[in-house]
Amino acid sequence: MKNEINMSDVWKWAKDLFPLNRSLTGIGNLETLKYLKDIDNNLSIKYFSSGKKVFDWTVPDEWSVKSAYLLDSKGKKLCDFGVNNLHLVGYSIGIKTTMDLSELKAYLHYDKNNPDAIPYRTSYYKRRWGFCISYNDYKKLIPGEYKVFIDATHFSGKMHYGELLIPGDEPSEILLSTYICHPSMANNELSGPLVSIALARHIKSNKVLRRYSYRILFLPETIGAISYIHKHQSILESNVIAGYVLTCVGDDREYSYLPSKYGDTLADKAVRSVIRFIDPNYKKYTFLQRGSEERHYH
């Protein structure tokens, strides 16, 4: 494994991983983790079994989708999952039916504020189906009957995740957590896993950074962190002295920082000591504006 960070490598990783259909579970997640393991062989690929109780949550069934699309009355294929996996609402059930456009519209999702974009929708914990379409394409739908085809199944399987431990001079750990459950979306969330695996390479090449140990997690959002905490709570409480959630770190906007619930932890102090030099105009949120794994690690 090369230890230096080469941005052309990171760009290639992003292009290779972008097409995969990631979700809470499924082959896309496993393929993503295997790809990351090829970058750093120390990454361990593990899983939680469907149906496992984790606190008051339950690990969901695994989801597999082969194809999904609509056909209009002229035989034109629309919302083709094979062209863009965002077209299918995540965790949709399988269905094969015909319905009029007036009825179909209840199952279509679009965003008027971003008329050229295909929105991202999921239904992890309620069995239903749906398609996502750009608003401009939605307006072009012709009246008549549409064939609906979704070849998807739910079954008792596995929810995979990745864990990378980098030992330091001390057993005290820095926790880095990111998530692998979004399909073809770059900033949210290929950026987090790629920055995390690149950081692992950088940490290993820099002895100055090896005072503390590092625990880097690649999880399905929410249920992944909850499951991991359920299994490793005592280890985390004993070893972790600071932690960060890496999410939406791939755009060109100002740096942003969401403080901890307490606001004065080691993690807070470390960020504040450097971010003002990197970007004096950085954006600071409040913990009340949390939206990712920081909810669970607290």
Task: Name these PLM-found stretches.
Residues 1-298:
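N-terminal hydrophobic/helix-forming segments and targeting peptides
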